[in-house]
A protein has these predicted regions:
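Glycosyltransferase catalytic domains, chiefly GT-A lineage
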Residues: 1-352
Length: 352
């Protein structure tokens, strides 16, 4: 593949408010192990319009050799937070194509606890990723049990990505170990930029808008939890559905490395996965969600002394008082607010 300027480029999303503190924690944790910014650049991307991040955040990014990039590429889906997780990495993927061997995307609420020993891919692989956390019974209505039929949301995703048939292999959810059709968690991934996986996923998002494919999604605010009703999947999971379809379009099974739980461990399901005392000594990337706003979690968790000391100096993170208008509305009215935004976009496209 020839000489590349960078071995690995890391990237994550940052926006004004809560994501600032989370992304700073992630950046600090990465720089513990990847100190050379010339070999391991880190990009903090703000891919949609909104209030600028604080100057203090920018200064801390600079001290950590983190490149802050504001580029409002997410315009058609700027009402939907999770679309940032596609538009942001797609932007960096394109920017570093031909310059970096690998790009690692991480959700902002992830922290690197230990040095990744396998953060690369075999020569024949184009992507590394982990399966989704849970199945339908626990709330992920896009998880289709193996040998069941696809719903129309997945059929649309396959069609937009150019996937011709259902793969003949399966994955297991992290929590229940439920066997499902390939369906990946978008919180951690490592890709070869030249594979253009995130760019395909971004293009799929754009096609939903331009082709008016809204009827393929459930955005009523109700998650479907029973196997008897698999007609549509929630808009809530569209980023993971589309990313999975993009991966299946670009890669054969042999070109996909499926990492273990230690590379994207769902901390909020700790009790369901492990028994006490809970062991985090082997965890590489911990997906902590909202668990680091206090220290309640640490009393019965086993950790090596070095990692425990580092966390003691950096956690809990501050819960920002400011919450964006969109998030406040979402917290107050739930997914009905997404439905309202979705209908607004739908009506706009129908009138054009």
């Amino acid at each position: 593949m020839g000489h590349r300027q960078y071995k690995i480029v890391f990237t994550f999303i940052v926006e004004f408010g809560d994501l600032e503190n989370k992304s700073l924690l992630l950046a600090k944790s990465l720089r513990r192990f990847y100190k050379d910014a010339n070999e391991y650049p880190i990009y903090a991307v703000r891919p949609r319009r909104g209030k600028e991040i604080k100057n203090s955040t920018k200064e801390q990014f600079k001290a950590l050799d983190v490149i802050y990039l504001y580029s409002p590429v997410n315009r058609n889906w700027e009402f939907f937070d999770f679309a940032n997780q596609v538009y942001g990495p797609a932007l960096i993927e394109e920017l570093i194509d031909g310059k970096a061997e690998f790009m690692v995307y991480l959700d902002a609420d992830v922290v690197c606890l230990h040095l990744p020993t396998e953060l690369s891919l075999p020569d024949n692989c184009l992507v590394g990723i982990t399966p989704v956390d849970i199945g339908r019974e626990l709330g992920n209505d896009a998880a289709i049990v193996a040998e069941d039929s696809l719903n129309i949301t997945w059929e649309l995703a396959y069609s937009l990505a150019g996937v011709r048939s259902i793969p003949k292999w399966n994955v297991n959810t992290k929590v229940e170990k439920l066997q499902i059709y390939p369906y990946f968690n978008s919180g951690f991934s490592i890709v070869r930029p030249e594979a253009q996986i995130f760019r395909l996923c971004r293009d799929m998002f754009e096609m939903v808008i331009t082709k008016n494919y809204f009827r393929y999604f459930n955005y009523s605010g109700k998650l479907v939890k029973t196997q008897n009703d698999t007609k549509k999947s929630s808009l809530f999971f569209i980023d993971q559905i589309f990313l999975t379809a993009a991966i299946l379009s670009k890669c054969s099974r042999e070109q996909i490395q499926i990492f273990g739980n230690e590379y994207n461990f769902p901390f909020h399901f700790l009790k369901e996965i492990q028994s006490e005392p809970y062991n985090l000594e082997y965890i590489i990337f911990l997906h902590y969600h909202n668990k680091f706003y206090d220290l309640k979690w640490q009393s019965n968790v086993r950790l090596d002394s070095e990692t425990r000391e580092w966390l003691a100096n950096n956690v809990p993170i501050k819960l920002e008082k400011h919450v964006s208008y969109k998030i406040r509305k979402y917290m107050r009215y739930g997914r009905t607010f997404i439905k309202w935004h979705f209908n607004a976009i739908k009506n706009k496209t129908e009138s054009d």
